């Protein structure tokens, strides 16, 4: 015979009005916060990734791929100039 964990059944939670009042506000707020985080460029600044227009500069149009694993430092220095 299975014992009870003392928690509310999942069906009771998702059919309650309180659940939907809380989540009707928080889910759209999280979506909006994420959209603002990315669209303002703050995500690029925090994580240090280049913006889409910064991948290729006017001087360097080739792909920055390291192909020689034994001389990787020299290649990285050449690619980042």
From Swiss-Prot:
Q: Where in the cell is it found?
A: Cellular thylakoid membrane
Instruction: Describe cofactor binding as the record notes it.
Output: With its partner (PsbF) binds heme. PSII binds additional chlorophylls, carotenoids and specific lipids.
Q: Which cofactor does it need?
A: heme b
Classification via InterPro entries: PSII_cyt_b559_asu, PSII_cyt_b559_asu_sf, PSII_cyt_b559_CS, PSII_cyt_b559_N, PSII_cytb559_asu_lum
Q: Where are the transmembrane segments?
A: 21-35
Give the GO cellular component terms, alphabetically. photosystem II reaction center; plasma membrane-derived thylakoid membrane
What's an example of a GO molecular-function annotation for this chain? heme binding
Annotated binding of heme, by residue: 23
SUPFAM superfamilies per record = Cytochrome b559 subunits
Membrane protein topology class? Single-pass membrane protein
Instruction: Note whether Cell membrane occurs among the keywords.
Output: no
Question: Mainly localized where?
Answer: membrane
Function summary: This b-type cytochrome is tightly associated with the reaction center of photosystem II (PSII). PSII is a light-driven water:plastoquinone oxidoreductase that uses light energy to abstract electrons from H(2)O, generating O(2) and a proton gradient subsequently used for ATP formation. It consists of a core antenna complex that captures photons, and an electron transfer chain that converts photonic excitation into a charge separation.
State the NCBIfam families in the record: cyt_b559_alpha
Q: How does it assemble?
A: Heterodimer of an alpha subunit and a beta subunit. PSII is composed of 1 copy each of membrane proteins PsbA, PsbB, PsbC, PsbD, PsbE, PsbF, PsbH, PsbI, PsbJ, PsbK, PsbL, PsbM, PsbT, PsbX, PsbY, PsbZ, Psb30/Ycf12, peripheral proteins PsbO, CyanoQ (PsbQ), PsbU, PsbV and a large number of cofactors. It forms dimeric complexes.
Write down what this protein is called. Cytochrome b559 subunit alpha
Can you name the source organism? Synechococcus sp. (strain JA-2-3B'a(2-13))
